[in-house]
Amino acid sequence: MTDISDRFDNLASDFDARVQGTTDWSATSPCEGWTARDVAVHVTNNFLGLVAGANGTESTTVAADEDVTAAWTDARAALQAVLVDPSKAAATVQSPFGPMPIEQMVGRIICADVLIHTWDLARATGQDESLNAEAVEGTYSGLKPMDAMIRQPGIFGPKVTPPAGADAQTELLCFLGRTV
């Protein structure tokens, strides 16, 4: 496995714990207008798009009546399989930054997305909200220079002022517009 594959696997495991622990998929999430199900479907659909890009097939999405836990589990395994196959991991897909190899997109975008949505799903469903501290630090330092770009509609909302003495996780979440 590569460093990115390992990091992805660790973060996906954390998200998986929240998916497996979710009992109310209709719970309101911190993402405006989204339920817990919407958060899990968003992450799953992102994975499905990358898998389709690696395989040269048309992307599928999670159906409204589909078991989101099963869809997530399958999509996670499929993306992990892509990441451990050097030729598939090197396949180019479209990203917010332009064309990018899948492995690079996972490292730059998907890992951050999974990390943040782990918290969103945990908050929505009353589960453990603690995030991987090393991933929090890396994500925060990676996103700070992209502040203007990530404020575009549909990415992240306006920053929230963190409380005095906030830990790194709280600072990251507030930077991304989450109310902690």
Predicted feature locations:
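Structured surface interface patches that mediate subunit assembly and partner/cofactor docking
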Residues: 2-17, 21-32, 48-180
